[in-house]
Structure formats: structure tokens, C-alpha cells
Amino acid sequence: MRIDPSTLNLKEKVVFINRVAKVVKGGRNFRFSALVVVGDENGHVGVGMGKAVEIPEAIRKGIEDAKKHLVEVAMVDTTVPHAIQGEFGRGRVLIMPATEGTGVIAGGPVRAVLELAGLKDVRAKSLGSNNPKNMVGATINGLSRLRTAEQIAKLRGKSVEEILG
């Protein structure tokens, strides 16, 4: 099920800009790639990559791409329902719930994704690759696989009390 970005009030954040060079006979041709995260700070977040000769154009393309890849994040108040490990390439991110008032404890690219998803109290630990693209991808992977107790109970045809014990 695709999420319609036009119905959401999306904010964007540029996580990483990379300059790449193609060496040709006449010298070097430079291009830029931009890794962009968009989110409504209310349970929807997406990530996109844009490439172009100019930085603003790369960012614009990244935002467009991110809007096409929005995911819904299961939340319990201001945190995640349970701990989960997301994986993308060799990047692994462990996302853990935190008590109210803790804030977002996460490094660099992971923090941008968690904040734009609308999580206020969450802890995250980056394991494996610290490449921004892999870290952001792993975070999105983890967040998209989160399920609340109500969702699991509905899937299994049981009550929430039976699931939680």
C-alpha cells in the first residue's frame, strides 16, 4: 500500500552529499549525489537518493525519490513498540524503546530518520558499516518491520492480553 505524499506535511533533511569524479581525457567530470530523508514527524518517513551535476538538483531529485518510498512506522506514544534490528547491505542498526523524556539517542544519519519519523524517545546503536546510505537503509528497514501488540493480535486472531501474557 503506497502512502500519498501530497496528503502529508513533509519535512526534509539532507543526510549526506557526495562528490564523485569521472576521469575523462580532458580532465575530471564532477557530479553530486544526495541522500535525503523526508518525514511528517507523525509515523511516516522515507529515504531517497538523487544524482546530478549541481547540488540543488541532486537534493530535489532525492526529495522526489524519498516521497516515492515512504513507509509507515508503528509507534507506541513517543517510542517504538519493541526492540528491532534493521539490516541493509552490511549496515545494521539496533533500535530500542526508551522511557519518556529520554530523547533521541542515536548517531548521525540514524538520528535524522528517527526524528523525521516522529519518534521522541528512542535509543539506537549502529552495528557494522557506518556508511550513511547503509545506516539510513538499515534504520528504514527496522522501522518498517515494527508491529504493535494490537497488530500482532489481529494477525493471530487473539486478544492483546493473550499476546502480552
From Swiss-Prot:
Pfam families: Ribosomal_S5, Ribosomal_S5_C. The keyword Acetylation does not apply. It comes from the Bacteria. Keywords: Ribonucleoprotein, Ribosomal protein, RNA-binding, rRNA-binding. Disulfide bonds: none annotated. One of its GO terms (molecular function) is structural constituent of ribosome. SUPFAM superfamilies: dsRNA-binding domain-like, Ribosomal protein S5 domain 2-like. GO terms for cellular component: small ribosomal subunit. Residues 10-73 form the S5 DRBM domain. HAMAP family: Ribosomal_uS5_B. The N-terminal domain interacts with the head of the 30S subunit; the C-terminal domain interacts with the body and contacts protein S4. The interaction surface between S4 and S5 is involved in control of translational fidelity. This is Small ribosomal subunit protein uS5. It comes from Clostridium novyi (strain NT).
